[in-house]
Design a protein with these regions (language model features):
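N-terminal targeting signals for export/organelle localization
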Residues: 1-19, 23, 171-173
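Thiol-/selenol-based redox modules, centered on thioredoxin-like
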Residues: 126-173
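Sec/Tat-exported extracytoplasmic proteins
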Residues: 39, 64-67, 71, 98, ...
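Structural microenvironment flanking redox-active thiols in thiol-disulfide oxidoreductases
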Residues: 57-119
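Second-shell loop/turn segments in exported
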Residues: 42, 46-49, 80-81, 105, ...
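Short active-site neighborhood of thiol/selenol oxidoreductases, capturing the structured segment around
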Residues: 32-54, 60
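Short loop/turn microsegments at loop-to-beta-strand junctions
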Residues: 17-18, 39-40, 138-140
């Protein structure tokens, strides 16, 4: 990438995704090594979320659709922060309802709450907290390079994705 530095640049934060091996909505194991050499966009959600996830997931879906239309080599990963309720079967139904393209987007589960809390904090400096009847979690999208380093951080609640799309198009070739 040449020219001016992106407003979304996260390289100075020196965030690196911790190794993982979790299960996607199709019951398949997905691990960090599956993304070696590839760009991927990650977020944290839970399917019963009443507040921010109903904004984040359609935004991620819009970015997925753009990446497919532009033929970008970009995968998408949503880590569930409610693994007790977001089982493989539940995630499969959820992804079918929202029109996820399984070839590009994995919704992950297969761990306990403590593990995803540690993973989110270690990898993204993003705390996950369970409250009495909800979860508090990051609303950011993290663009990860083929070496597992977070290189961009985007606002997952953005009402206009045009700047994010343009940045992804410049970064992911």
């Amino acid at each position: 990438m040449g020219g001016a530095q992106s407003e979304f640049d996260a390289t100075e934060a020196k965030l690196e995704v911790a190794d993982f091996a979790y299960t996607n909505q199709n019951g398949e194991e997905v691990s960090l090594s599956d993304f070696e050499g590839d760009y991927w966009l990650a977020d944290m959600i839970f399917t019963s979320c009443p507040t921010v996830c109903p904004i984040m997931t359609p935004n991620m879906r819009e970015l997925q659709d753009m990446a497919i239309a532009e033929n970008l080599d970009l995968s998408f990963v949503s880590f569930s922060i409610d693994p007790e309720n977001d089982t493989v079967e539940h995630l499969k139904g959820y992804t079918e309802n929202i029109g996820v393209n399984d070839a590009y987007w994995d919704f992950l589960t297969g761990y306990d709450l403590e593990e995803i809390q540690a993973f989110a904090l270690d990898s993204f400096k993003a705390p996950v907290e369970k409250t009495e009847d909800d979860f508090l979690h990051s609303t950011r999208f993290f663009l990860i390079d083929g070496e597992g380093k977070v290189i961009r951080i985007y606002d997952g609640l953005a009402s206009d994705l045009s700047d994010i799309k343009a940045d992804i198009q410049r970064t992911v070739k």
